[in-house]
Amino acid sequence: MDSIRIRGGKPLSGKIRISGAKNAALPILCATLLSDGESLLRNVPALRDIETTSALLRFLGRNVETAPPLVKVGAGDNVRPEAPYELVKQMRASVMVLGPLLARFGRAKVSLPGGCQIGTRPVDQHLKGLEALGATIRLSRGYIVAECKRLRGAEVVFDLPTVTGTENLMMAAALAKGRTTLVNCAREPEVEELGRVLNKMGARVSGAGTDVIHIEGADELEPFDHAIISDRIEAGTYMVAAAAAGGDVLIENAPLEDLEAVAAKLRQAGVEVGREGDCVRVRREGRPLRAVDVTTAPHPGFPTDMQAQFMVLMCLAQGTSRIVETIFENRFMHVPELARMGAHIDVDGHTAHVHGGAPLSGATVMATDLRASASLVIAGLVATEGETEVLRVYHLDRGYEFMERKLAQLGADTARVEGRDG
């Protein structure tokens, strides 16, 4: 397994460009199952999760050509509406093939999902919604087995906002007969992006990006050509990295309008954040950081996917900050690794108290999930002595395109070491 080595203590300066959004590309790749013909996705990042989804689509019978930032998906000769454990276990977003397969072919057999181990993250809301549209669903030996004639539009009320659940139901409803109304939907920009693509394909989607979405299903859908939006979480990660390491960084293609909750907390902490041309500028030169409290929330609140990175920033601030995780259970697995570097953090259930001000030191640490791995890289950037080695960076490669190279562009001393066991 590869690792990343970092020698910290250097301020960051310069300019980097943000890649396409992984969390937008994955459901849009799944949406290609809804039509024949060749669809073209542009601005697709070169990530492990994109490779996994492409492999899954090939297994299902699609022709997939991947040459990021371009991915082509065309109809194959034989459709196999079964997503096996060997592929789905690698990434929980694989469950999003369930809705398209069921709507298009009348049956689907999809393994229960895997991916980052940050809580149970159940799929019950997906199944409840598909049953409301007329599907018959059973669980058999670790698989979801779903069947239907043609799905029919209905009202589905989610018990809680779920991004992948909202997206799965949107795709299924795009081929359902009649009108579907989804209530208490996730409002993330990636959901809105999927709505744009489904409209290009011939469905009529309104309200995507709000808590109520209406979908008028079509008898058949067309292939599409679409450029993926920028990755707001990647942008937020580099904003926090620039704030933590200090310096002056321009982040090109960063969707600041989707990061207002993160930008507001950075400003409260004493960091300058603003627009400069087509870039977001993040600057902290010589100013101390202030401790601020953060509570994660569904969009447009503070994203759970930025919690670990922001915790590292608060390790450097004077005073104690409180970080409350409301979205996922078991999402403080980075805390013991940060403690190895000298962080003082107390965890009580869903709340972490970060006692900042003590310097971090380099250490060998182990990534446990995607965003935790990014937080450990940021911690390595600010470690005042010694070298940091982050093991198991295959987690990082699931969601960050060439992170060590982009940081090196900004002056960081980072390098990938191939083949390190961990």
From Swiss-Prot:
Its main location: cytoplasm. It comes from the Bacteria. GO terms for cellular component: cytoplasm. Coiled coil: none annotated. It catalyses: phosphoenolpyruvate + UDP-N-acetyl-alpha-D-glucosamine = UDP-N-acetyl-3-O-(1-carboxyvinyl)-alpha-D-glucosamine + phosphate. The active site is at residue 116. Pfam families: EPSP_synthase. It is an enzyme of class 2 (transferase). The modification 2-(S-cysteinyl)pyruvic acid O-phosphothioketal is found at residue 116. The keyword Amino-acid biosynthesis does not apply. Phosphoenolpyruvate binds at residues 22-23. One of its GO terms (biological process) is cell wall organization. It is found in: Cytoplasm. Its EC number is 2.5.1.7. UDP-N-acetyl-alpha-D-glucosamine binds at residues 92, 121-125, 305, 327. GO terms for molecular function: UDP-N-acetylglucosamine 1-carboxyvinyltransferase activity. CDD domains: UdpNAET. Keywords: Cell cycle, Cell division, Cell shape, Cell wall biogenesis/degradation, Cytoplasm, Peptidoglycan synthesis, Pyruvate, Transferase. Belongs to the EPSP synthase family. MurA subfamily. This is UDP-N-acetylglucosamine 1-carboxyvinyltransferase. The gene is murA.
